Amino acid sequence: MVLDAAADLTEVPGAGRTRIVVAGAPPPTRTIERVETELGWEFIQIYGLTETAPLLTMNRGRAEWDHLDPSERARRLSRAGAPALGVRMGLTVQGELTARANQVMEGYWEQPEATADAIVDGWFRTGDGGTIDDEGYVTISDRKKDVIISGGENVSSIEVEDALFSHPAVAEVAVIGVPDEKWGELVLGLVVLVEGESVSEDELRDHCRPKLAGYKIPKRIEFRAELARTATGKLQKFKLRESYWEGFDRKVN
């Protein structure tokens, strides 16, 4: 909304002296690039949970990135960031991010079983899948509950969303798994188009091919007028999945 409103302004307020801090679901790379190039605002991303009080990592542009192409700089800023002071980040064998720090909770109030599931050998299990690169930067691949399992392969909905959103005709996108007799789950893209723009399913799939492995490309794409969101604008994927999973036991993915 801010980016769209700024298009009608002759001068963007705070250009060159404003910082925008983003937390929650990782934003699309194209959005990060637009914030920095069109608004002139510094983009900072942080990651954490209520149980970690809340900061675990932070990603702020570094001086050595200043010479980079805006798209490459945005790609680096799309990572969740490096561990904050006093925080250690790790990974389980299954690829779930774990954290250890003084500010991590001791446990859930009067819920010993939930506490035992969440904290193992002193490490808090975040419920987020991810990676840690050679620089120590954390990248969130997906919430465990949002990972799509298609033909035995794990598909990150965030990765597919980023590929679809990079098409200029796409205004909003959500990617979910829906039941399929052959593959278990199919990758479904729900897309809201920019007003006045048009694009076909095949054109969007072709756009994704250089960016995604073949099994990650959405088998189906549906166009919507809007997507279910919370009051703060976060996608409600459980609501988007509901109608597709009626009559099936598994409704998480």
Name these PLM-found stretches.
Residues 5-6, 111, 151:
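Residue-level signal for well-ordered alpha-helical positions
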Residues 18-23, 27-46, 50-138, 143-147, ...:
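Conserved AMP-binding/adenylate-forming
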Residues 22, 175, 222-223:
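Hydrophobic/anchoring residues in structured secondary elements
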Residues 101, 106-107, 117, 129-216, ...:
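AMP-binding/adenylate-forming catalytic core of the ANL superfamily
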Residues 242-253:
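Acidic/polar alpha-helix N-cap and adjacent early helical turns
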